[in-house]
Amino acid sequence: MTFSAVQSEIRPVQWNGHTCVLIDQTVLPGIYRTIEIRTSDQMATAIRTMIVRGAPAIGVAAAFGMVLGWQEAPQGDPITHLERVAATLRATRPTAVNLFWAIDRMLTVARRDPSFARLEREATAILEGDIATCRAIGEHGLLALPAAPERLRLLTHCNAGALATAGYGTALGVVRSAHRADRLERVYADETRPRLQGARLTAWELVHERIPVTVLADTMAAHVIGRGLVDAVVVGADRIAANGDTANKIGTCGVAIIARHYGVPFFVAAPWSTVDLNLSSGEQIPIEQRDSEEMRAIEGVALCPQGVEFYNPAFDVTPASLVTGIIVESGVYAPGELAAAGQVRLGR
């Protein structure tokens, strides 16, 4: 496809006053299309089916799902209806904590100031705040990258870019900042089975911005890192426990183990809203199990014989001991520093 129909800046979630417009990420890179979301149930379906995906992006989408829910509410008892909408949205994706953070924030506002205008402003603030947050993550991440070589080769897993956020991205925010500072030689993007977010989405974003990218089969990461072709690994996150254990797309932990073995720094880039200080470790992070059809076939073409069984967790947990640094909008922290910094941020 050409990029003539694509905005210069990728915005996966947009609000037009009474409906929400999403980039349909299930059909990229071959087709670029948007879908208009008119109801809260449609938004829940879009999140569950990964039309919109990525922890920050589904938080933003859920916030506007709550605005849509308010529009649907019967007169006289909108809060009860909104609580039902919140429950439906919460049930869509269990691992990404940004979803719950955004819904709780919207409910708090609705109970304090129950009006459409106030909810719309809050959802818009979540969207705009996420873009600013991602840009800050990008700048902090740039400073955390190795000083040498001057032009870096970075490896990433899955898609933690503009498509996974309100715009700019977390891990790809670091990539974009490095590119703009002329410190980026190349990105290696793991294809990220089974849904191929690296091959389909990360590569699409980077080609769109003319950033050099090489797609790898997931099984190639050890070979490429071991041959000295990678200077640092930067990934996103769907939930980070207080001790720095990080849930991210399945396969991330394996990349972290490889990076540690070969002495390559491994960074996690995510907003503070992804950090769950209520969980002491990654053992408490719920791991979403997805449909076996994602592994059985690609675009209807069977990959395995009939009769086999599938195990399809969407995420794994990378132990904090394998993480060099966690890049958030306020700076870069060693995993052991995260909880204290989070408590200070909350004023506790």
Curated annotation (Swiss-Prot):
<feature type="binding site">
    <location>
        <begin position="53"/>
        <end position="55"/>
    </location>
    <ligand>
        <name>substrate</name>
    </ligand>
</feature>
<keyword id="KW-0413">Isomerase</keyword>
<dbReference type="GO" id="GO:0046523">
    <property type="term" value="F:S-methyl-5-thioribose-1-phosphate isomerase activity"/>
</dbReference>
<dbReference type="InterPro" id="IPR027363">
    <property type="entry name" value="M1Pi_N"/>
</dbReference>
<feature type="binding site">
    <location>
        <position position="197"/>
    </location>
    <ligand>
        <name>substrate</name>
    </ligand>
</feature>
<feature type="binding site">
    <location>
        <position position="93"/>
    </location>
    <ligand>
        <name>substrate</name>
    </ligand>
</feature>
<feature type="active site" description="Proton donor">
    <location>
        <position position="238"/>
    </location>
</feature>
<comment type="similarity">
    <text>Belongs to the eIF-2B alpha/beta/delta subunits family. MtnA subfamily.</text>
</comment>
<comment type="function">
    <text>Catalyzes the interconversion of methylthioribose-1-phosphate (MTR-1-P) into methylthioribulose-1-phosphate (MTRu-1-P).</text>
</comment>
<dbReference type="InterPro" id="IPR037171">
    <property type="entry name" value="NagB/RpiA_transferase-like"/>
</dbReference>
<dbReference type="InterPro" id="IPR011559">
    <property type="entry name" value="Initiation_fac_2B_a/b/d"/>
</dbReference>
<dbReference type="InterPro" id="IPR005251">
    <property type="entry name" value="IF-M1Pi"/>
</dbReference>
<comment type="pathway">
    <text>Amino-acid biosynthesis; L-methionine biosynthesis via salvage pathway; L-methionine from S-methyl-5-thio-alpha-D-ribose 1-phosphate: step 1/6.</text>
</comment>
<keyword id="KW-0028">Amino-acid biosynthesis</keyword>
<dbReference type="InterPro" id="IPR042529">
    <property type="entry name" value="IF_2B-like_C"/>
</dbReference>
<dbReference type="Pfam" id="PF01008">
    <property type="entry name" value="IF-2B"/>
</dbReference>
<protein>
    <recommendedName>
        <fullName>Methylthioribose-1-phosphate isomerase</fullName>
        <ecNumber>5.3.1.23</ecNumber>
    </recommendedName>
</protein>
<feature type="site" description="Transition state stabilizer">
    <location>
        <position position="158"/>
    </location>
</feature>
<feature type="binding site">
    <location>
        <begin position="248"/>
        <end position="249"/>
    </location>
    <ligand>
        <name>substrate</name>
    </ligand>
</feature>
<dbReference type="InterPro" id="IPR000649">
    <property type="entry name" value="IF-2B-related"/>
</dbReference>
<keyword id="KW-0486">Methionine biosynthesis</keyword>
<dbReference type="GO" id="GO:0019509">
    <property type="term" value="P:L-methionine salvage from methylthioadenosine"/>
</dbReference>
